[in-house]
Amino acid sequence: MEPIGARLSLEAPGPAPFREAPPAEELPAPVVPCVQGGGDGGGASETPSPDAQLGDRPLSPKEEAAPQEQEELLECRRRCRARSFSLPADPILQAAKFLQQQQQQAVALGGEGAEDAQLGPGGCCAKCKKRVQFADTLGLSLASVKHFSEAEEPQVPPAVLSRLRSFPMRAEDLEQLGGLLAAAAVAAPLSAPPSRLRPLFQLPGPSAAAERLQRQRVCLERVQCSTASGAEVKGSGRVLSCPGPRAVTVRYTFTEWRSFLDVPAELQPEPLEPQQPEAPSGASEPGSGDAKKEPGAECFHFSLCLPPGLQPEDEEDADERGVAVHFAVCYRCAQGEYWDNNAGANYTLRYARPADAL
């Protein structure tokens, strides 16, 4: 009778029954050789385990595909684990979470068409693509203010400044420039000179001014329009000084006395002139007494400001528009009030073209 161990070792291995492969999580058990003694106790034999025998034979296609399916299933489970969002609810985060869930479902189903349907041509879902976000909803400021110091001057490179400098002109360039300017001056049409304020009165001479000063104690002697447009009128004259408070005022109008303005004049003492030596013959020259200034007289100066709209736009009908400025001089002192109004006609200035342009 043969020993049981020898009978097991000599038994021809037959085809093992089909069984499913162990799961991927479980590692295969190591092959342990089986050592059994013979009937006489002196012999020893190593018998491979059934798992080792299964490893020696070729696997069927179904058995080879089983471990691969297990690995794919585990990988899918890992991908399906959603990331936790600890931040507060936000539309952008919700949209990102929704997109991640759609991608995970598409991977789990293994369908590429589902992912294409959820994603637009730009790689984002239609819900995220049409969403508008404002800075205040994200906790940001709607406006940013930047302060600049006046002391911070920009550092301009010298190469940039060199481009702004004019190139040195040659003699030929200057000659050509002079010819071009002369041609332009000839080709330009001569425009009519602008109209100016012209006095419509005649100021008295020295003798008449002295006589008027003695008669009415105030006399206008000079009028001048300082600018071409006549926006300012300056004048001067003399008054007889008297004790007590005194003041000179110029009243003028440019609305034909529908309204008027009073401008105070500045009073100054009349400067003293050096006495001229007497003629050796003892006879005075004719008219020399007219130039003598009255003793105790004071000079006054005034300035009238006019609005800019008085000058006519059309130079041709400047004389017909009737734009005029009327004024008179008033002298107030302790003895009373005195006027110099051009013998009741007032001093009048009117816009007119120069005489040489007519």
From Swiss-Prot:
Name of the protein: Protein phosphatase 1 regulatory subunit 3G
Residues where Phosphoserine is found: 86
Ranges of residues in domain CBM21: 210-350
GO cellular component, one term: protein phosphatase type 1 complex
InterPro entries registered for this protein in UniProt: CBM21_dom, CBM21_dom_sf, PP1_regulatory_subunit_3
Residue numbers spanned by region Disordered: 1-71, 270-295
GO biological process terms held by the UniProt record: glucose homeostasis; glycogen biosynthetic process; positive regulation of glycogen biosynthetic process; regulation of glycogen biosynthetic process
Keywords: Phosphoprotein
UniProt keyword Phosphoprotein, yes or no: yes
Source species of the chain: Homo sapiens
One term of GO molecular function: glycogen binding
Keyword match DNA repair: no
Job description of the protein: Glycogen-targeting subunit for protein phosphatase 1 (PP1). Involved in the regulation of hepatic glycogenesis in a manner coupled to the fasting-feeding cycle and distinct from other glycogen-targeting subunits.
PROSITE patterns linked: CBM21
